């Protein structure tokens, strides 16, 4: 009885977590509109995805208890340092003090938003963490990775570079 209960609890705990070997970059589902994303940051300031039109935005859904989420932090940190890209981490339903302790131990170079109710997670993801979405300069979701982004992943970088290329060409032609 105990073994069956323990196994059930472990299954429930890890059912929504995907390691890197399971991650795959895929186009945003055809016909599925890009949901709005309006949440508060850790200081309680309102934040709206629509305000970032003109930039490529990488939206990452995570939680401090999610091992693959923690493992992919260096990849997201590298992306956040690139011109023309904004990385936003959306924390799933954790208390503010938990998020603050986590970000103190793992300094993030990007904005963290709070999804207190889990509604944004439901609208943006297939229910698996981590999930990372690439939004183009017009505000349209283009790509989604379900599961941990591997440290050596070239597909996500190439997809972002392809979105940035037309912008770089326009800037070069204006000079």
Where on the chain are the PLM-derived regions?
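Bacterial N-terminal signal peptides
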Residues: 5-16
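N-terminal "domain-start" segment that seeds a small globular fold
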Residues: 20-49
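Short loop/turn microsegments at loop-to-beta-strand junctions
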Residues: 34-35, 57, 129-131
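Short active-site neighborhood of thiol/selenol oxidoreductases, capturing the structured segment around
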Residues: 48-67
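Hydrophobic beta-strand core positions in alpha/beta domains
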Residues: 58-60, 89, 133-134
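Structural microenvironment flanking redox-active thiols in thiol-disulfide oxidoreductases
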Residues: 70-106, 116-122
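Thiol/disulfide oxidoreductase modules built on the thioredoxin-like
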Residues: 101-109, 116-164
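Non-globular targeting/processing and membrane-anchoring segments
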Residues: 166-175
């Amino acid at each position: 009885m105990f073994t069956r209960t323990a196994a059930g609890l472990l299954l429930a705990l890890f059912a929504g977590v995907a390691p890197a070997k399971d991650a795959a970059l895929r186009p945003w589902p055809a016909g599925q509109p890009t949901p709005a994303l309006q949440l508060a940051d850790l200081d309680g300031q309102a934040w709206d995805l629509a305000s970032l039109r003109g930039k490529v935005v990488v939206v990452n859904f995570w939680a401090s208890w999610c091992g693959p989420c923690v493992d992919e932090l260096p990849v997201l940190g590298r992306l956040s340092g690139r011109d023309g890209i904004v990385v936003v981490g959306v924390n799933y339903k954790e208390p503010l003090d938990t998020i603050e302790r986590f970000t103190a131990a793992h300094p993030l170079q990007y904005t963290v938003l709070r999804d207190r109710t889990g509604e944004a997670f439901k609208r943006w993801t297939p229910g698996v963490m981590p999930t990372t979405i690439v939004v183009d300069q017009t505000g349209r979701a283009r790509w989604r990775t379900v599961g941990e982004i591997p440290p050596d992943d070239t597909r996500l970088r190439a997809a972002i570079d392809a979105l940035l290329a037309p912008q770089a060409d326009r800037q070069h032609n204006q000079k």
